[in-house]
Amino acid sequence: MAKDIKFSEDARRAMLRGVDQLANAVKVTLGPKGRNVVLEKKFGSPLITNDGVTIAKEIELEDPFENMGAKLVSEVASKTNDVAGDGTTTATVLAQAMIQEGLKNVTAGANPVGVRRGIEKAVATAIEELKAISKPIESKESIAQVAAISSGDEEVGKLIAEAMERVGNDGVITIEESKGFATELDVVEGMQFDRGYTSPYMVTDSDKMEAVLEKPYILITDKKINNIQEILPVLEQVVQQGRPMLIIAEDVEGEAQATLVLNKLRGTFNVVAVKAPGFGDRRKAMLEDIAILTGGQVITEDLGLELKTATVDQLGTANKVVVTKDDTTIVEGAGDSTQISARVNQIRAQMEETTSEFDREKLQERLAKLAGGVAVVKVGAATETELKERKLRIEDALNSTRAAVEEGIVAGGGTALVSIYNKVAALEAEGDVETGINIVLRSLEEPVRQIAHNAGLEGSVIVERLKHEAVGVGFNAANGEWVNMIDAGIVDPTKVTRSALQNASSVAALLLTTEAVVADKPDENGPAAVPDMGMGGMGGMM
């Protein structure tokens, strides 16, 4: 296919048009008085959102050169979303400001490579300063404030703070759609996995159809149990202790299952069998997790262990186990806290190394089950359109809160970026490197300018006053007052602000140093006509 090539000024101008179209659509959502954007969906009702990355991903431009510019900025939003989970609109605003200022200077004769060095130098200093002014997040109130600012809803803030308090910072918090109107929180404490009892005759509460075992022994194996003789020795030891038993195995079937059910119904002993969670290597890892949590051993041939020689000492224990037809919950496993901590650190290290998003998600789930529990935020709304919009906002708020716990918080509303202005301005440089630093300085003002603009005010006036205010004092666009941002609960996670600045500068520097752009040439003749299949003379067929 023939290619269309544009060089230097033409290339950069075409890409800038794309950057502007995407950024202008995204930046109207910034701040407490930001507006929504409606996205057409081929099926179903349109999506109404103020989430920057969702809008950016939907934009596809007709001109291939403009589209390349738009896609570059869309990547800024996506990358910021991947790393920090929020701040995508801020990242887009920063990228647009840097690209616009940079192109003005490059067009006027500045060397793009020198400008790039200046941008990198300024951003490195800005990030150091952000870390220096960052405050750790400690109280439940602070967590609620971060979530409320991100979602624009105080109730959501309280809900997420409650969830994080209940399951801990490492706990899994999932967001699901509710069937009702209310948004509520459901917390599962302890380790839960999605496998239920192998026979309904094992239940202890026939009304709720669940089996509740108090202080049970837990046999963990990756083998299939067909013959009761295999587990008879350990079963007899448990019966002598007069305690219930949970068996986690690949499967329990045939004669073994029948014998267990029969003895359960006769009241000889209380035992429940469940299938092991997961598949393949992941199953082995999850069984090992359960063993560490309950202080037991996995009876597996990999370790040279056999079921018929297993003893009570190799079994795990827990305060309580609840088994339903769909899942099993182990509450307060009796494992050694040092071993559990070591396992948690091992899983964390695996999360850092893995490149697969799916694997990372599964590792995060395992981490949560060991470290805390699982909280489910059930999102309710009156209509499907409102439900989708609300769910997106709550996801952003959750990501924002996690980022705040990780790296702390800075003053919100773009205030932190302006407060580091003087430190960046103090950098010594000359020529094109100085030009690069000035480009970053101009972009640091842009989020405040845009927040003020969206609130119907003159951004430049707000920025100038902000530069002369005391550190931490900023403009609250929600009510038009000048307040101490952190005291007023208007905060941004440091990680979100840092990621936005890093990703914006990275793409801006790349675009400024672009000298040629290659795109497919559109086919001027349009698609070829369908050829005549020579069946014109067959009209007499019935």
Swiss-Prot record:
Source organism: Listeria monocytogenes serovar 1/2a (strain ATCC BAA-679 / EGD-e)
Gene Ontology cellular component annotations, sorted alphabetically: GroEL-GroES complex
Compartments reported by the entry: Cytoplasm
Binding, ATP: 29-32, 86-90, 413, 476-478, 492
PROSITE patterns linked to this entry: CHAPERONINS_CPN60
GO molecular function: ATP binding; ATP-dependent protein folding chaperone; isomerase activity; unfolded protein binding
Main location: cytoplasm
Name of the protein in its database record: Chaperonin GroEL
EC number: 5.6.1.7
SUPFAM superfamilies: GroEL apical domain-like (SSF52029), GroEL equatorial domain-like (SSF48592), GroEL-intermediate domain like (SSF54849)
Top-level taxonomic group: Bacteria
Catalytic activity: ATP + H2O + a folded polypeptide = ADP + phosphate + an unfolded polypeptide
Disulphide bond pairs: none
Keyword tRNA-binding attributed: no
A Gene Ontology biological process term: chaperone cofactor-dependent protein refolding
Keywords: ATP-binding, Chaperone, Cytoplasm, Isomerase, Nucleotide-binding
